[in-house]
Amino acid sequence: MINLTRQRYRVSNLVTGGTSLDVILSHSPNKFTFPPLLKSCAKLGDVVQGRILHAQVVKTGFFVDVFTATALVSMYMKVKQVTDALKVLDEMPERGIASVNAAVSGLLENGFCRDAFRMFGDARVSGSGMNSVTVASVLGGCGDIEGGMQLHCLAMKSGFEMEVYVGTSLVSMYSRCGEWVLAARMFEKVPHKSVVTYNAFISGLMENGVMNLVPSVFNLMRKFSSEEPNDVTFVNAITACASLLNLQYGRQLHGLVMKKEFQFETMVGTALIDMYSKCRCWKSAYIVFTELKDTRNLISWNSVISGMMINGQHETAVELFEKLDSEGLKPDSATWNSLISGFSQLGKVIEAFKFFERMLSVVMVPSLKCLTSLLSACSDIWTLKNGKEIHGHVIKAAAERDIFVLTSLIDMYMKCGLSSWARRIFDRFEPKPKDPVFWNVMISGYGKHGECESAIEIFELLREEKVEPSLATFTAVLSACSHCGNVEKGSQIFRLMQEEYGYKPSTEHIGCMIDLLGRSGRLREAKEVIDQMSEPSSSVYSSLLGSCRQHLDPVLGEEAAMKLAELEPENPAPFVILSSIYAALERWEDVESIRQVIDQKQLVKLPGLSLSG
């Protein structure tokens, strides 16, 4: 702040009215006079002073100086006066490579990517100059892989590929285009990697969800790089640990942070708070927060409040929230979201809505994330009133077209028992989204309410709309078929899942089919489904055994009980259930033999289970 004030004072004294102009002229301005002043204007975003300086450049005849004219182009680009910058470029008597670089970089920074690429192409054709900075600048604005590869070829032909600035830009470009493997190959090729190169590669890995490689790259840097990791490196590495829930490596990084004296850097400290919170070490997160002291900002406060909430320390979170004002800070949308979402996830609906009302009282507009969290908290008839209130806020916020909010609304009404309301919302939304989650909440909701035909209807509509069903979709519709005993439809969907969509049934799907076939008395078919599994779990045998008890099938019951006993040798339930089958069939000798087996194995009978059925 002090530096900026000095710059403003300097520029103001030199370029505003009367004496200032005399000062410039009396000191015989030269080609080194104007560029630093123009740079100061750019940093301050001071368009007015920049224009005054522009006039002085022209008046004193220094517009012909490439260095000064380039500084004008750069200044206008920095203060977002693109038209003025391009006009200066056009009027320049002679363009240099630096002028083209300033214009290309400025166009990219201001979002004029096509114009930047066009200017880059024109510069190549006209031969007005191109260097590694030009190529790196254009790579920085490239967002498609085809164009990026063409630029890569150009860099190779021009001999720029191995320059660290260009190599780093290529790593970033490939990462940005989702080609992290190509980014890794380019990273390996860069001969003299800078800390910026390592940071670009680590950031790219994180953007592409390959967090598991970040610790290895960080270790490579420490082992082979002549440069030390900086705050950006530490933030990225710590953030990766948070995503991986790698507490051990996170603690090692914390130790290194302290050794390098980065622990009081706001970004690094905030990343540590987030890492410890996600790794369920809330006490460590709190200690890091307290050690930040004067360097912590609202983001740090939001991180620790969120961390306390996700670790169930809601009282501490509220205490921290109440201290914000004493630190001269005001809660923002993220602060409120942390508390409201946290209380919602903890099932504390009253507290969640209490903070929601407080948020509204300070005229804070609820975010879509906040509304979604509150809707998820409304899960029964007792919270229906609250759910309807949030529906009103959804309408007020014109958020009825947001797929996540809409899905949460449907789910809320289904959970609260108003399937007809959920259906009205579903039917009104056109065109229907391709996200299967939107359809799944309808199918599972109908299934749980016993409206199985409606669940199947939605599934068929999903197929008509060419939506790709997920594994969860099949779980929901098979469960619905099981509840209504529709064996034919369930079997058809089970085959469809494998033959048409290529899914391998999970334990949940197998369980649904066993339950469906078992309820209908088709126990042999249920057993055949289990036999198709490579490693049947205890849950599928438990489901089959339950069906055997319902239909009094001692043969399959014995087989299921023995398999279940092998998988869970300490569990007495299979013997107790088998005993109840024998008792129902009045096979008392078998009941007694089961009792002896339980005694011999010293199994503790679970409460609620009877040996006599």
Swiss-Prot record:
Gene3D superfamilies: Tetratricopeptide repeat domain
Gene Ontology MF terms in the entry: RNA binding
Keyword DNA-binding attributed: no
Residue ranges crossing the lipid bilayer per the database entry: none
UniProt cross-references to PROSITE patterns, sorted A to Z: PPR (PS51375)
Region (Type E motif): 540-613
Family designation: Belongs to the PPR family. PCMP-E subfamily.
Annotated protein name in UniProt: Pentatricopeptide repeat-containing protein At2g02750
Source organism of the structure: Arabidopsis thaliana (Mouse-ear cress)
Native organism taxonomy: Eukaryota, Viridiplantae, Streptophyta, Embryophyta, Tracheophyta
